[in-house]
Each structure stands twice: as structure tokens, then as C-alpha cells.
Amino acid sequence: MDIRYSCNQKDFKRYTTEEMRDEMLITGLYKADEVVAVYSHVDRMVTLGCMPVHETVSIDKGIDVWANFGTHYFLERREIGIFNIGKDSTGIVVADGVKYELGYKDCLYITQGTKEVTFASADPEHPAKFYMVSAPAHCSYETRLIKMADANHRPLGSVETCNKPVSYTH
């Protein structure tokens, strides 16, 4: 797991573009059948990527949870949001024995205290790409799947300004 430290604000003011990229940019999040994780000391956030192709992958694969977080399992005191950003793919997430199918741009929130989380792809020819962000949690909420079709769609901008994005709130 890559660990990123916060930078000194005085030093940051004089960073070059290259230095900013080195400090902030996360690359290489998707490797077949691996979990890639980047821990940031800023807000104690963990950004993760997983692209299961030929096997089912556990959320803590390659992460020493005890050494990095002082917990027995990854979500003991953390919560996580998971998006499938693999186009034309269906991803399967199993959280404590409950199976969730995520289509492209679907989101799954998993609450703290969930012991086992695994990832798989329905079709290895079109693997799911799970983009995840985990944060410390202090209470439990209901684990919930939110399909892209059920997300709040909020059109922004205008055709006249050639800027007409849509904000999707899960």
C-alpha cells in the first residue's frame, strides 16, 4: 500500500507542476486480480482500485491491515464507497455473504463492521473496475446498493455556453 503524507503549506506554494503531480496523482490503480491501495494522511482516506479478471479478490489482498490500521479487518472502523467504472461490465461484490451486482457506474456503500468483502467480474472478457474510497467511521449505517438509474440526475449549465454537464448524486 502506497502511503502519502500531507505536505507543508509553505513548501507546497513553491512546488513545480511535476512536484504537484508526484504528490497528488494516483496512477496504476487497476492491475488484474489485485487490490491497489493508496493511504493519505490527509483525512485518513484510502483510495483503492480492483480489477478482478480470473479470480475472486478479497478487499485486503496485499494490505497488512493490522500494521497499517491497527484493526483485525479492513472495515472494522472504516466505511467504503464502491463504484464500478468498467464499461460494459458487471461486477460482483460479496459483503459478509450478501451478493451485490454492480453495473457500469453503479455504487455500493458498505458500512463499518463488515468483515469480509470480495470482488469478482461476471465476465472476464469485460472485467469490472472497482474504484473505491474508504474513510474512518464512528457508527454503522445500512449497506446499500444505488443503481445509476436511481441516482439523482441534476442537469447543469446550458447549450448556449457549450457547457451542459449532468451531476449524478448517489
Q: Predicted regions span which residues?
A:
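Conserved small/polar residues in nucleotide/adenosyl-binding loops
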Residues: 169-170
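Intrinsically disordered, low-complexity, positively charged segments
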Residues: 7-66
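Basic/polar N-terminal segments that are highly enriched at the extreme N-terminus
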Residues: 1-4
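Glycine- and acidic-residue-biased ligand/ion/polar-headgroup-sensing regions
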Residues: 43, 50-55, 72-96
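Short hydrophobic-aromatic micro-motifs
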Residues: 46-47, 83, 108-110, 130-133
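Short beta-strand His + acidic residue motifs that chelate non-heme Fe in jelly-roll/DSBH
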Residues: 91-93, 116-123
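Double-stranded beta-helix
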Residues: 124-164
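Short acidic-glycine-tyrosine-enriched beta hairpin
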Residues: 96-111
